């Protein structure tokens, strides 16, 4: 009990002493102005016996330029399929909002639904006239994104795939733009006519 009261007294003295707390800095110019101590390295702010050390020069993310050219996609087709219409509508709305935030042009259309029916016996040991019909309805949403870079497509796809709801499947089809190979750039008939002229002479 005596130790507790002694510890409480020490804590109170330390808490009251925080008001007269001072900071010594060896580097840079410091100026004290009405409860604020500004330094070139750190900023110290005091509000009612509470101080926070905040680094003044926060490191900004550095944008790196790579030598490798980015992939270009002409079209990115995302086919989402599921059994619940409300879930697909909600997910389509989410995907459109995410695309608009990234500045991507997007079109959404709804392909016709696919219905599979299975006709089975009610039980294994029963007459043929006692049957049950099961039905599986698969609904689709197709998201068409056009004119994307590879990095933008990767970021967008990762974001929408991480937030894919349960019971929903996704198929992604990418149409990539490629440079025309060197052997196709020149028309073949021009080289053939030159070879014929050389063989004649």
UniProtKB/Swiss-Prot annotation:
Record key words, sorted: Mitochondrion, Ribonucleoprotein, Ribosomal protein
The keyword Ribonucleoprotein is annotated on this UniProt entry: yes
SMART domains: Ribosomal_S10
Organism domain of life: Eukaryota
Subcellular compartments: Mitochondrion
GO cellular component: a single term: mitochondrial small ribosomal subunit
Signal peptide: none
InterPro entries the UniProt entry points to: Ribosomal_uS10_dom, Ribosomal_uS10_dom_sf, Ribosomal_uS10m
Predominant subcellular localization, coarse grouping: mitochondrion
Transmembrane segments: none
Subunit-structure text: Component of the mitochondrial ribosome small subunit (28S) which comprises a 12S rRNA and about 30 distinct proteins.
Similarity section: Belongs to the universal ribosomal protein uS10 family.
Name the UniProt record assigns to this protein: Small ribosomal subunit protein uS10m
Originating organism: Pongo abelii
Gene: MRPS10
């Amino acid at each position: 009990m005596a130790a507790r009261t002694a510890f409480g007294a020490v804590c109170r003295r330390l808490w009251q002493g925080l008001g007269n707390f001072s900071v010594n800095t060896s580097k840079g110019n410091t100026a004290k102005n009405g409860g604020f101590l500004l330094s070139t390295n750190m900023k110290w702010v005091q509000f009612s016996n509470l101080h926070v050390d905040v680094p003044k020069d926060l490191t900004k993310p550095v944008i790196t330029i790579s030598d490798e050219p980015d992939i270009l996609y002409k079209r990115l087709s995302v086919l989402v399929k599921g059994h619940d219409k409300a879930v697909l509508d909600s997910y389509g709305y989410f995907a459109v909002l995410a695309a608009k935030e990234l500045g991507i042009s997007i079109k959404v259309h709804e392909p016709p639904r696919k219905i599979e029916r299975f006709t089975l016996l009610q039980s294994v040991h029963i007459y043929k006239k006692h049957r049950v019909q099961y039905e599986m309805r698969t609904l689709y949403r197709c998201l068409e994104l056009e004119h994307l870079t590879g990095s933008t497509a990767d970021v967008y796809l990762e974001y929408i795939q991480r937030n894919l709801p349960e019971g929903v499947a996704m198929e992604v089809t990418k149409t990539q733009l490629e440079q025309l190979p060197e052997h196709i750039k020149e028309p073949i008939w021009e080289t053939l006519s030159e070879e014929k002229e050389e063989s004649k002479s």
